[in-house]
Amino acid sequence: MKLKNPDKHQTLSSNAKVDKIATDSLKNETDIELKNMNNEDYLRMSEHESIDPFVSASTIQTGIGIAGKILGTLGVPFPGQIASLYSFILGELWPKGKSQWEIFMEHVEAIINRKISTYARNKALTDLKGLGDALAVYHESLESWVGNRNNTRARSVVKNQYIALELMFVQKLPSFAVSGEEVPLLPIYAQAANLHLLLLRDASIFEKNGGLSASEISTFYNRQVERTRDYSYHCVKWNNTGLNNLRATNGQSWVRYNQFRKDIELMVLDLVRVFPSYDTLVYPIKTTSQLTREVYTDAIGTVDPNQALRSTTWYNNNAPSFSAIEAAVIRSPHLLDFLEKVTIYSLLSRWSNTQYMNMWGGHRLESRPIGGALNTSTQGSTNTSINPVTLQFTSRDFYRTESWAGLNLFLTQPVNGVPRVDFHWKFPTLPIASDNFYYLGYAGVGTQLQDSENELPPETTGQPNYESYSHRLSHIGLISGSHVKALVYSWTHRSADRTNTIEPNSITQIPLVKAFNLSSGAAVVRGPGFTGGHILRRTKSGTFGHIRVNINPPFAQRYRVRMSYASTTDLQFHTSINGKAINQGNFSATMNRGEDLDYKTFRTVGFTTPFSFSDVQSTFTIGAWNFSSGNEVYIGRIEFVPVEVTYEAEYDFEKAQEKVTALFTSTNPRGLKTDVKDYHIDQVSNLVESLSDELYLDEKRELFEIVKYAKQIHIERNM
């Protein structure tokens, strides 16, 4: 990690001011003299002015920027917005200069310490260049047509180029999943898959105005559903494989493991989370989505400050084991919370009056879920003689940390610690930004600056960082050894807001992990990789928890509720607002007992009866009932859909009838079409499942029987 301003921060230098910063508390620092080191040793130290965490801020910024841009355009955008999105992505993934795709490859290669084969690299880069050139041509034609949508020739050109480009993606995606190279190619695969799904969405958005027939639109939509499932499965599978390959026993292996976990989350899994929201039948208007997952930046500790003393690197200095570090700093699944106060307890490492280090030795954190009770946790040494330092975090987004990894020496025994941290913060709703710092004095051997923005850069570079930041600090962990105290920061994406605000003119997705409490029998469990965060589970009947929501007027606006769930059993979902029941309905099992959670085990279904909120702030509750203990019911998120854009029950029924009929040939109503796949039948089954029991109970049962018949024929055909 390169120092951002070597002239401003003199690092590991003899007879120089330590970290001279324009703050009153540091104006009168005394000079430092290195003890027990000759000039040759000093020269070797001062050559190392960087920490090498295998991180390229520009690489990560590309992933963060694309995910952030897409989060802001979910739903059905205007044609002009689509053209603008393609323009942005082309600029990010095919910029002038060095290939961004090569940078992606090199980034993962550095983390996993393995090179992609020459053939796989060259094949991928060649195919990516072809896709980029073809996408640029399509984008240019799309812009021309958007400017004159009545021009039949322009429409014909766009249609032909669209069909050719979509086929090209189908043909080229396998180049980014070459056997044996799936892990290092994963960011490339995810970005290309994302582009393919965005392209498939175009068919549904433009519909017949783009010159496509109803049959063609249906074909592209079915492919979108199929590829969403396949691409999600691939990304989650190879992320898990990559993590398993890096799991080992010592602190150094934990560093690589954590970097891979963080960077693949940012470059791959954040995209996977939004794949389902490209479905224009389910999300026909603007949709607000949130990422509640946490990522962990590098431990704050010196890395390779002196080649003569290997143990001056924190993870070589009798640091805890891989599993001990993981247990100490990685939080167990929990409800989303926000920091309110940090109390820091310090330790003193002293060799002499001119060589010492006051360092962060432990802390107490106070945090709170949205509308919930205060939680307190402690780590490290909290019983010290040095007065603690308290920093207030309430209602502030701490978007950046600048941390000094310090080093002190007792003869040849290094001590690693953190003598100073600058916290940069902003009020989320106000144009007010400032900072706080922890610093009690340091005169050790030297420091290395670690800036969180090198690992979690802002979404854009055209605004001040306090406006365009991508993440907020959510938790602080501590790696504690006999001679090591290293901080690890946890961060959440800024899309996970503090208010759970439901808008009257958009679909609002709220992860259930944003509840303010858990009901007895409910648990937060680790997300399966494609949900954007943790999920909730019940193994016996009862409520999951309660979510505090804020409502933007008008209060006359009515909504319908949907949920993304997986279950090993048939069950009933019940919902209520402020204790008053609003919905109750029967829903089917989506998976078998013992089956792993994956994309196909989750369904998004909802209730047909609309409701409205009467208060600006309300408590929404959902529970799972009428099932046998020992089964498993999971919920990822709740969706509030304005009733005007929800498919009316009658339209839903007609659509379901059409889809069921379309499974069979026109000449033989009981003959299954040869191109019908398993996922087609599942898709139709889900559509029938969502029909209103109140209005179409008998018709729903009849359609289910037909779908079961289609499933039976399909199974027999495959046998």
From Swiss-Prot:
Source species, domain of life: Bacteria
Keyword Disulfide bond on entry: no
Alphabetical list of InterPro entries matching this protein: Galactose-bd-like_sf, Pest_crys, Pest_crys_dom-III, Pest_crys_dom_I, Pest_crys_N_sf, Pest_cryst_cen_dom_sf, Pest_cryst_dom_II
Keyword line: Sporulation, Toxin, Virulence
Pfam families referenced in this protein's UniProt entry, alphabetically: Endotoxin_C (PF03944), Endotoxin_M (PF00555), Endotoxin_N (PF03945)
GO BP annotations listed: sporulation resulting in formation of a cellular spore; symbiont-mediated killing of host cell
GO molecular function list: signaling receptor binding; toxin activity
Family: Belongs to the delta endotoxin family.
Family annotation (PANTHER family): ENDOTOXIN_N DOMAIN-CONTAINING PROTEIN-RELATED (PTHR37003), PESTICIDAL CRYSTAL PROTEIN N-TERMINAL DOMAIN-CONTAINING PROTEIN (PTHR37003:SF2)
More about this protein: Toxic segment of the protein is located in the N-terminus.
Function as written in the Swiss-Prot or TrEMBL entry: Promotes colloidosmotic lysis by binding to the midgut epithelial cells of insects.
Protein's recorded name: Pesticidal crystal protein Cry1Ic
